[in-house]
Amino acid sequence: MKLGRAALGLLLLAPSVVQAVEPISLGLALAGVLTGYIYPRLYCLFAECCGQKRSLSREALQKDLDNKLFGQHLAKKIILNAVFGFINNPKPKKPLTLSLHGWTGTGKNFVSKIIAENIYEGGLNSDYVHLFVATLHFPHASNITLYKDQLQLWIRGNVSACARSIFIFDEMDKMHAGLIDAIKPFLDYYDLVDGVSYQKAIFIFLSNAGAERITDVALDFWRSGKQREDIKLKDIEHALSVSVFNNKNSGFWHSSLIDRNLIDYFVPFLPLEYKHLKMCIRVEMQSRGYETNEDIVSRVAEEMTFFPKEERVFSDKGCKTVFTKLDYYYDD
């Protein structure tokens, strides 16, 4: 970049030199400068380029989390600080690795979407954001060796093209044990792996594994008359990581990623209560352009099922199905 600027300056500020240069040579020199310096910048004005989005705004990320994610004070704080700190670190020692755990409908996928949108204009549709779904991309246990090779090649190729690549692994609880260990070299504290640096990449894992342990903690607080906001990360994180590591039905079962402490944060997503469902419904109404109708909000929330059976504290599907239930009341 600096070399291109210097070359352009010499050509513009030294007419005596320019006159002595053959027209063809001068044209080639100018073309080289324009192609190598100016063209990429013009191109990135009209198409997505790696790392071309404006600097990550802490305020914008916090606003998205506050307005779109409900009942998850732990996840909000961890995600905000971890992502903002990582993106603004010019020389991270390793990739950022986040493992999001909780029941369905609590916001795990939504958070990965928010992260992607705050880093790339295209969000989940960006060429630099890659989503893997265990049951879709890695369905057969007999093909684990093949999947490992393919996964390594895919990650290596995409990080080579864009150091700030984001990789999202959904349904980790359904992934075949041992498969995810194939990416261990990319998550470790290496400057280079076969000539490629992975230190600016982001890896996000989504899983239902450990949800029972998270629920136990939340229920204990509720039964003790404590506010869920009083739950601290230290109350859950260690027990969560141990639970996931020892869960034979989890893709992290005895994984070297956990054993070698390569997961930066185990992020617990608490089960949602009745009041949180109503928040989800209101936001969905607003996104569809409807005025908030509290009667409909209450009716939709009351149609959901809750657990434990006797106390009916937490929604068993979170906010996942409130959107389709809302369709019933706005059948155009």
Swiss-Prot record:
Entry's EC annotation: 3.6.4.-
Short name of any one Pfam family annotated for the protein: Torsin
MF terms in GO: ATP binding; ATP hydrolysis activity; ATP-dependent protein folding chaperone; identical protein binding; kinesin binding
GO annotation, cellular component aspect: cytoplasmic vesicle membrane; cytoskeleton; endoplasmic reticulum lumen; endoplasmic reticulum membrane; growth cone; nuclear envelope; nuclear membrane; secretory granule
Top-rank taxon, per record: Eukaryota
Catalytic class of the enzyme: hydrolase
UniProt subcellular location: Endoplasmic reticulum lumen; Nucleus membrane; Cell projection, Growth cone; Cytoplasmic vesicle membrane
GO biological-process terms attached to the record: cell adhesion; chaperone cofactor-dependent protein refolding; chaperone-mediated protein folding; ERAD pathway; intermediate filament cytoskeleton organization; neuron projection development; nuclear envelope organization; nuclear membrane organization
Reactions this protein catalyses: ATP + H2O = ADP + phosphate + H(+)
Signal peptide (residue range): 1-20
The keyword Endoplasmic reticulum belongs to this UniProt entry's keyword annotation: yes
Region listing for Interaction with SYNE3, in residue ranges: 312-332
Family: Belongs to the ClpA/ClpB family. Torsin subfamily.
Function field: Protein with chaperone functions important for the control of protein folding, processing, stability and localization as well as for the reduction of misfolded protein aggregates. Involved in the regulation of synaptic vesicle recycling, controls STON2 protein stability in collaboration with the COP9 signalosome complex (CSN). In the nucleus, may link the cytoskeleton with the nuclear envelope, this mechanism seems to be crucial for the control of nuclear polarity, cell movement and, specifically in neurons, nuclear envelope integrity.
Protein name in the entry: Torsin-1A
